[in-house]
Amino acid sequence: MPTYHEVMTTDLATLTTAAERWDGMAKEFQKQETAYRRDVHGIAMGQTWQGLSADAASSRFDVTLKEFQYAQTEAKAVASLLRDAHAQFVGLRGKLKGARDEAVHAGMRVSDQGVVSYDTEKLSQGERMALAHDPDYRTSVRKSVGSWQERIDQLVKDVEDADKGVEIAFAAVVVDSDIADGTINGFNGRAQGDIEKYEAEEAKDIALRVDSGKASAADYRELRRLFHDNAGDTAFSRTLLDDLGARGTLNLSNTLESLAHYDDTKQSGRYLDIQQGLATTLATATHDPHSDFYERFRTEMRKAGTEQFTLDGLSPIPDERVRGYQSLVTLMQQGHGYSGQFLEDTADDVRHAEESYAAAGHTESVWALRDDFTGKDRGWFANDPLDGVLGIMSGDPATSTEYLDPARNDNLDYLLHGRNWDTVVDHYATPPGGTTTGPPVTVEDGDVRKGFGAALEAATTGDVPGSYHPVGEHTVPQARILQHTINTLYSANQAQELPTNLATPLAHVLTSYTPDTHGVYAESSSRYDIDWDSSGSVWSDKDGAHLAVGHQRLAAVMRGIADDPQAFGHLYGAEQQYAHQVLADIPQGAGDKTIQDRVVDSSRAMGAYDGIRSDVIFDERFQKTQWAADFNHGIGASLSTALMFNPVSDLSPVGDLATRTVDVWAYESNKEHVAEANLAATQQNAETYDAGQHDVEHLVRAWANSRGHDIDSDYTQYFVHAGQDQYDFGRNHTLNTLRSDR
């Protein structure tokens, strides 16, 4: 392997010099071809020499003429490979020099052999003393030296990997690629001038050995190197996948997964690393959706995607086989960087496959298997490929928005209520009195809709999913997707009992839309003051896009979220924070009407949220005390989310006072939530579930205190009482829409 010193000192210009000479050799062969065609080959083609001997000579002369042509092809390819090698080595050496310079700038010394050490000559006296007597300082120096050494060693290793690729290319370029051309070990008429294409051919050969179970440890090491060294290289990626084809790609992926998870788990890291390399190759090869390769590979995958494959060890059930798209998405989950178009096309093709299967008369999903695939040990397999590709898509919020926008397509409708999500064959129905096995009875998998929920979250917030999002400017398509989701769930009677695994992502989403949900419940402007059963609208202004939907539609979805107490607690806490901000934004010196209007808005909105909470307490399905504890935990998490809105301390010119007030309020509020949860679920008690009103009172007192008024003053009490009727209005109307028995 090349050393650091060799990498830094080798005269790379010799490669371009050699390339020029190989170009010159190609020109000489061209001259010889011209002379041979004129002086030898032309004789056999004329009229003066005829008969068997002429025919025999002509065929031999044709072979020789082609050899002159092939020699030119090979010489030009060698020249191109030399220039390719030169470009690679120059680039890699440049990275190594850059790392060395950065290390020196960071206080390191790098020897001619690439050994990193701490440069003590530049230290001040104080730094020298610390190095001599401070163990922590010495440890930090040691770690820094080690980090720089690892970086430089890896860059030298990258040169070694590139050197191996060059070696592979030069060994292959001189091999006669046509054994039927009349020569043995002749010139290579199909020689290529791209190192990566020869590396792809090497990777294909190893992949075939992997599939057949004949790969050696050296093969696996080389395949890892090939994927690492060519990560992001289009020529390598397309050549390899073209050679393997869609089926070959899936076979390789399945074999690697079997080895990693079942057959050779001690070496699982090796196989998963190769699998990641294959996924990167797929992402690179499909990055340009307008390329000939893209159309060719997609066409192949449409066919292979519904075919059945063996994945050894996946299922304890004999003869269980998986579909191609399940294997494809399992592979894709190992990588990243896929183009948005490839993700959308894959999702479209998977949907087409399942719709075609249903149209053919099948009652079960095309992806149905006799086992579930959830949890750490099983969840890696994408048994639901559409949900899987949506999960990948969620990492690209712009693509998620485009894919789910109801103004562009019907994908959102399909996913919300048009799709069969049952992918697990629970059992087979047997006709009464019969002895034959009937049709399969399928159920949802444990991680059903997790990918869809993540994509929905990304599509409506413009942010990667998985956490609560700050309030931000939304686009019209983002708001339109959320509006359509709320209306569709409500119309399909799925709002109050949300489809499995949608509650948490919807809570994440609605937190980001708290100003709009506050406006809907408060009816704070004509845009929000709409019929309670209205499908609403979406509009935009200087602050971005907004949405409004009917009060009872929004409340129904929030009631569905409230089955997850922590998720609903976070929504509740977000409303508390926003209500704080509404009051904090009241101008100094504002009149009583302005103040009262803000208090009324906050009271009405908080009343609506509390109506949802009261409905949960009224519902006998829940262990109320635990629900209340989890709900309080969600509120606490929400209030500790930094900069979701302006900090609560902004309410006061002396932030500590306001913070202490909020702390006391939160403590008392939590006790009231738990106390209410322990009351019997009767209509009389339901009318007294008013801890939320106390939350509003604490809110108003904190605001008044921030403006210099005692929390029990007449001024403060006036505004505390101003919103009580409106709190009751929001709470009771919400509870009435949720409970027909009131």
What are these regions (language model features)?
Residues 179-738:
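Non-catalytic all-alpha helical scaffold/repeat segments
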Residues 1-182, 735, 739-742:
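N-terminal secretion-targeting helices of virulence/extracellular proteins
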